[in-house]
Amino acid sequence: MTLPFRAMEDLGLDALRSRWTHPVGVAVIDSGIDCEHPELRGRVAESARVTPQEGGAFQVVRHPEPLSQDLFTQGGHGTAIAGLVLRVAPRARIHDIRVVNPGGILVDARALAAALKFAALHEDIRVINLSIAADASWSNEHGIRRWVDEAYRRGKVVVASLSNRKRQGPPVDFPDVIGVHGADLGAYGIRYGPCLTAEFQSWGDRIPAPSAGGGESLRGGNSFAAAVTSGLAALLLGASPDLTPFQVKSLLKEGALGQHEDR
């Protein structure tokens, strides 16, 4: 069953931007960001890198100043994600958490857990964006679920993209997470379907986004749909900082561009 569509503008994006009263940090757990891109310069609060330690542990090394472009960022995935968040929520502050290797692969559950722990405990972060694919076997490994739950308990909105793989890994299927997959909905469109693995569909087709090294390119897919949704969550929190993650999710449902049931 498909219910009547509602325009995303019903959320009042311009009105929300004008009502922004509170700083909102958005963690981009990804491949890293080209912080010198003209669209991102001065808008990244910090960079942090997840690094392996002896004995198989991982540690987050924090850098008060944003890191420059390196081998990790050259693919441009994290740069595009951060840029899309900021195009939706221009006054958000990005926290660059580098966890994906130069090949664009998340190689270890412990690395993801370390990144989630850092973001969950960070006082300045309210939204956590995960546009990365984790292995389906990781759901109960090495604290991933624990730190997603802790982030939710601390009032942080966790947004994750559906994997492009057949089997889904964490945390997109966790109940405390806003799961997103891409669709051709037009600029900033969003749709809700409670029976889907990823409950929300968001704009995920031919999206102009910043490219590492300057300029922009067209992007598409689940990752970028999640970034748009994270930007919408940041807008809501900037206008109403006392909102809980549950309330943010409910408001996104109410502003959805239509609701449907999985057939």
Regions found by a protein language model. Give the residues of each.
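Active-site core segment of subtilase-fold serine proteases
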Residues: T2-V88, A92
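C-terminal subdomain of the subtilisin-like protease fold in secreted/lumenal serine endopeptidases
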Residues: M1-F5, D10-G12, R126-L130, G238-R263
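Extracellular S/T/G-rich loop segment that most often corresponds to the catalytic His/Ser-adjacent loop
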Residues: S161, G169-G238, D242
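Structured catalytic cores of enzymes that bind and process phosphorylated ligands/cofactors
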Residues: V28, A80-A82, V88, I97-P102, ...
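Active-site/binding-pocket entry motifs
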Residues: D34, V50, V100, G186, ...
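Subtilisin-like peptidase catalytic core
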Residues: H63-D135, L252-A256
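Structural detector of well-ordered beta-strand residues that form the stable sheet scaffold
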Residues: H95, V157-V159
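Mature extracellular/periplasmic domains of secretome proteins
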Residues: A15-T21, L106-N129, N140-R154, K166-H181, ...
